[in-house]
Every structure is written in C-alpha cells, then in structure tokens.
C-alpha cells in the first residue's frame, strides 16, 4: 500500500485556494478592491499584494534559506503577476515534498 501524500495534497489545495481567491478578487471593481475591513492588511488590494509577496518569501526561505526581498519602490503586482507568483510557489512546494521528503519519513511540526 502506498502512503497517502498528505503534504502534497495540502499544497495542491493551497495552490487551488490561492488562485481561486485571486480569481474572485479579479472580478471586483476598483472601488471594492480599495475597501478595507477590520483584521485585514489595509485594503483588499493591499492584502492580496501582502499575501502573494509573503508566499513567495516563504517559498524562497524553504528553498534557499533566505527570504525573498521585494524592492520597496517596485510597483504593485498585476493580477497576472500575482497568479504567476502563486503558481510558481505552489507548484514548487508540491515538487519539494515529492522530491525532498523520502517516502515514509515524517515531518516534525
């Protein structure tokens, strides 16, 4: 019996959910994307930028030991760029668990 690829499945769902969230937010008007709520990272647009950049930084840290540093003066990411970054990190995480964690080995929390 083959082990159930739990981490790969979780990362696959994570990628799907991130891209789905981005897809939903793409359909929002500019006014809606500029709105904010309690507990967010500013506006919806700012929150999207934050979570996509953070995802890239987490992935970089896992792969290289170093965080990704987004230039301070860089313009905001477009929706196409955010989708590309999310795909790159999401697919990289899935590939990482397929190739870096031997079958039957446990990952300590």
PLM features per residue range, with description:
Residues 1-109:
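Aromatic-glycine hotspot motif
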């Amino acid at each position: 019996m083959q082990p159930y690829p739990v981490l790969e499945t979780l990362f696959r769902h994570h990628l799907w959910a991130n891209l789905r969230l981005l897809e939903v937010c793409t359909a929002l008007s500019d006014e809606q994307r500029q709105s904010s709520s309690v507990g967010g990272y500013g506006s919806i647009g700012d929150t999207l930028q934050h979570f996509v950049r953070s995802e890239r930084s987490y992935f970089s840290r896992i792969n290289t030991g170093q965080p990704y540093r987004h230039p301070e003066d860089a313009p905001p990411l477009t929706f196409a760029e955010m989708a590309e970054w999310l795909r790159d990190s999401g697919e990289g995480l899935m590939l990482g668990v397929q190739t870096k964690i031997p079958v039957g080995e446990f990952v300590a929390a």
